Amino acid sequence: MAKGQSLQDPFLNALRRERIPVSIYLVNGIKLQGQIESFDQFVILLKNTVNQMVYKHAISTVVPARPVSHHSGDRPQGDRPQEKSED
């Protein structure tokens, strides 16, 4: 798995598994809504009244309708646990 997808794949997979409705904003400003049916390295299959194949290079933002509980085995680089403050 490529380093850049270590966060992307578990996030999209959690959205797919839990059937969480999403809003997908494209780089041209168009908003698409539906549920993620499937995805691969290059596309997301979005299901609503019809299925749409959306190319990832055209996506700006993926916004879940509710919080997502995605758990990947390792923590992304640069993401450290919060330190407790000692007052």
Swiss-Prot record:
Residues 71-87 have a biased composition (Basic and acidic residues). CDD domains: Hfq. Belongs to the Hfq family. Pfam families: Hfq (PF17209). The keyword Iron does not apply. One of its GO terms (cellular component) is cytosol. Residues 65-87 are annotated as: Disordered. Keywords: RNA-binding, Stress response. GO terms for biological process: regulation of DNA-templated transcription; regulation of RNA stability; regulation of translation, ncRNA-mediated. NCBIfam families: Hfq, PRK00395.1. One of its GO terms (molecular function) is RNA binding. This is RNA-binding protein Hfq. Homohexamer. Residues 9-68 form the Sm domain. RNA chaperone that binds small regulatory RNA (sRNAs) and mRNAs to facilitate mRNA translational regulation in response to envelope stress, environmental stress and changes in metabolite concentrations. Also binds with high specificity to tRNAs. HAMAP family: Hfq. InterPro entries: Hfq (IPR005001), LSM_dom_sf (IPR010920), Sm (IPR047575). PROSITE patterns: SM. The keyword RNA-binding applies. Transmembrane segments: none annotated.
